[in-house]
Amino acid sequence: MNNYIKALLIIICFSSCSISDKNKYNLDVLEATHLNKNILNRNYVGMTRQQIVYIFGIPIISDSFDDIYHYYLSDSKNNNVYPKKMLNLYFKDNKVFKFNMT
């Protein structure tokens, strides 16, 4: 009888893990809530390409001739997607020298 109770508790514990699966984290989309022009200008201007890829990941579009990386930003709350933004990082001498968000 004691073994049945232990088995039942183990099953309940493992099945409760699937409840937390509703709030998935999407790694493919950067959240724009934490990025504004002051933060970008203060922290990311002057960084190298390798540092940007380490922080933001591989860009969705990279113009090899124009030295521009494009990142897709989205705000989401309660499964509602709010206006989407594009973060464009411009490189000069392998360092970020300007950016814009559209």
From Swiss-Prot:
Domain of life per record: Bacteria
Gene3D superfamilies, per database record: 3.30.1450.10
Coiled coil: none
InterPro entries cross-referenced by the UniProt entry: BamE, BamE-like, BamE_dom
Xref: Pfam families: BamE
Protein keywords: Cell outer membrane, Membrane, Signal
GO molecular function, one term: protein-macromolecule adaptor activity
One record GO biological process: protein insertion into membrane
Subcellular location: Cell outer membrane
Stretch forming the signal peptide: 1-20
Recorded GO CC terms: Bam protein complex
Described purpose of this protein according to its UniProt entry: Part of the outer membrane protein assembly complex, which is involved in assembly and insertion of beta-barrel proteins into the outer membrane.
Annotated family: Belongs to the BamE family.
Subunit record text: Part of the Bam complex.
Protein name (database record): Outer membrane protein assembly factor BamE
Originating organism: Buchnera aphidicola subsp. Acyrthosiphon pisum (strain APS)
Lineage of source species: Bacteria, Pseudomonadati, Pseudomonadota, Gammaproteobacteria, Enterobacterales
Gene: bamE
